[in-house]
């Protein structure tokens, strides 16, 4: 009997409406409190420098988080900088715009005095700098190379190859084969002896010629003296 009365009390409209109201309040409280507990998910993005030489991957929850990580990674503490889109140079200043961007967006860090430039402009500027710094092309008129090598390990000097190139078009080479050390010494002594003999013959010929010249001058002087004494003696006799 008591069990039946309790069942009827549960089915009473007031208790039923009260139970539904409490359940609705709990569900509403959960739905309201859940969004407040949610935090923005970390979004992958990439950051590059103004010259596009350095590119880093960063996970950031918000624009403020991204700015702080960029400052730490690129060591920009106490240095003013701004973030722009790498593709077109649009400035990223608000959180709403940052959240509206797709994942893996590439940002560019611009420091004070730097401006956004397209990749084509940067390539053009690099090409101009390389052309201005490139040295003028020089044309070789003549080039001579010497190559010393040995055909036999016992060779003293070996062989010498001389190669000459004119205007990078015409070339001429010559191989000079040297003899062994003994043959080189013999040839040197032979040429030395020949030069000494030739020098001796020259000295002998020169000395004989000088002797003949001196003898001839000495013979002329007495004859002239005798010819000058005859007129003087004749005058004295008269």
Swiss-Prot record:
Gene Ontology CC, one term: endoplasmic reticulum
Subcellular locations according to the entry: Lipid droplet; Endoplasmic reticulum; Nucleus
Record PTM: Ubiquitinated and targeted to proteasomal degradation, resulting in a short half-life (about 15 minutes in 3T3-L1 cells). Protein stability depends on triaclyglycerol synthesis, fatty acid availability and lipid droplet formation.
Location of region: Required for liquid-liquid phase separation (LLPS): 1-35
UniProt-listed PROSITE patterns: CIDE_N
Induction annotation: Down-regulated upon hypertonic conditions.
Principal cellular location given in the protein's record: other
Pfam families documented for this protein: CIDE-N
Molecular function in Gene Ontology: lipid transfer activity; molecular condensate scaffold activity; phosphatidic acid binding; phosphatidylinositol binding; phosphatidylserine binding
Sorted UniProt keywords: Activator, Apoptosis, Endoplasmic reticulum, Lipid droplet, Lipid transport, Nucleus, Transcription, Transcription regulation, Transport, Ubl conjugation
All residue ranges annotated as the CIDE-N domain in the record: 41-118
SUPFAM superfamilies noted in UniProt: CAD & PB1 domains
UniProt catalytic activity: a triacyl-sn-glycerol(in) = a triacyl-sn-glycerol(out)
Superkingdom of the source species: Eukaryota
Gene Ontology terms describing biological process: apoptotic process; execution phase of apoptosis; lipid droplet fusion; lipid droplet organization; lipid storage; negative regulation of lipid catabolic process; negative regulation of triglyceride metabolic process; regulation of apoptotic process
Oligomer status and interactors: Homodimer. Interacts with CIDEA. Homooligomer; undergoes liquid-liquid phase separation (LLPS) via its N-terminus, facilitating lipid droplet fusion, occurs at the lipid droplet contact sites. Interacts with PLIN1. Interacts with NFAT5; this interaction is direct and retains NFAT5 in the cytoplasm. Interacts with CEBPB. Interacts with isoform CLSTN3beta of CLSTN3; inhibiting the lipid transferase activity of CIDEC.
Role summary: Lipid transferase specifically expressed in white adipose tissue, which promotes unilocular lipid droplet formation by mediating lipid droplet fusion. Lipid droplet fusion promotes their enlargement, restricting lipolysis and favoring lipid storage. Localizes on the lipid droplet surface, at focal contact sites between lipid droplets, and mediates atypical lipid droplet fusion by undergoing liquid-liquid phase separation (LLPS) and promoting directional net neutral lipid transfer from the smaller to larger lipid droplets.
Family: Belongs to the CIDE family.
Domain notes: The CIDE-N domain is involved in homodimerization which is crucial for its function in promoting lipid exchange and transfer.
Protein's name according to its UniProt entry: Lipid transferase CIDEC
Gene name of the record: Cidec
């Amino acid at each position: 009997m008591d069990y039946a009365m309790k069942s009827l009390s549960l089915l009473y409209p007031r208790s039923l409406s009260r139970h539904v109201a409490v359940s609705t309040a709990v569900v509403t409280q959960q739905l309201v409190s859940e969004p407040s507990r949610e935090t923005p998910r970390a979004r992958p993005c990439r950051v590059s420098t103004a010259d596009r030489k350095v590119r880093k991957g960063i996970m950031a929850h918000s624009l403020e988080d991204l700015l702080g990580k960029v400052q730490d990674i690129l060591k920009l503490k106490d240095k003013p900088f701004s973030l722009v889109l790498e593709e077109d140079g649009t400035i990223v200043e608000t959180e709403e715009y940052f959240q509206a961007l797709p994942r893996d967006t590439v940002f560019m860090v611009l420091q004070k005095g730097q401006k956004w430039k397209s990749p084509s402009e940067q390539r053009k500027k690099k090409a101009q700098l390389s052309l201005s710094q490139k040295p003028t092309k020089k044309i070789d008129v003549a080039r001579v190379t010497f190559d010393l090598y040995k055909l036999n390990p016992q060779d003293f000097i070996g062989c010498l190859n001389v190669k000459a190139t004119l205007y990078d078009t015409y070339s001429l080479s010559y191989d000079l084969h040297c003899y062994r050390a003994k043959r080189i010494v013999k040839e040197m002594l032979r040429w030395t002896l020949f030069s000494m003999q030739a020098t001796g013959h020259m000295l002998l010929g020169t000395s004989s010629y000088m002797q003949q010249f001196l003898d001839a001058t000495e013979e002329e002087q007495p004859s002239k003296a005798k010819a000058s004494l005859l007129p003087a003696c004749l005058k004295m006799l008269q």
